[in-house]
């Protein structure tokens, strides 16, 4: 009788482990912006200086001073912070970047709540374009 209980317990443990491995091994869903943002144009494209200052204040701790995703907080998050110099990132429209910065997701804060002026978030988008 004891051996039967041990076998059941072991089987349940192995099943639970398999479920956890599958759940954590999956890549996060692709982060897409709604269509209306994909065509948005940056009304503040020339304001790179303000964007640089705001990036240093709000983004650098995770994304690093050069936008490589290697800021001091990045290692503690358990997820990639992304590389703003990458072709993949730079291929997004300004509106897509603006949307993601504004709404956030998972460990990425929703900066629409802390950087409340749209023009300031657009200025950060302008600065991010210079990181190519």
List where the protein language model places each region.
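Gly/Gly-Pro-rich "capping" loops immediately C-terminal to redox-active cysteine motifs
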Residues: 41, 48, 52, 64, ...
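Bacterial N-terminal signal peptides that target proteins for export
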Residues: 2-14
């Amino acid at each position: 009788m004891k051996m039967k209980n041990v076998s059941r317990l072991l089987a349940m443990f192995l099943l639970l482990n398999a479920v956890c491995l599958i759940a954590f091994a999956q890549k996060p869903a692709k982060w897409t912006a709604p269509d209306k943002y994909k065509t948005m144009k940056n009304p503040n494209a020339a304001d790179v200086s303000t964007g640089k200052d705001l990036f240093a204040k709000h983004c650098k701790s995770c994304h690093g001073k050069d936008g490589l995703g290697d800021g001091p907080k990045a290692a503690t998050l358990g997820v990639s912070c992304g590389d703003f110099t990458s072709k993949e990132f730079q291929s997004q429209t300004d509106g897509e970047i603006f949307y993601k910065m504004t709404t956030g997701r998972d460990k990425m804060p929703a900066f629409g709540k802390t950087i409340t002026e749209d023009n300031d978030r657009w200025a950060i988008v302008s600065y991010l374009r210079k990181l190519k």
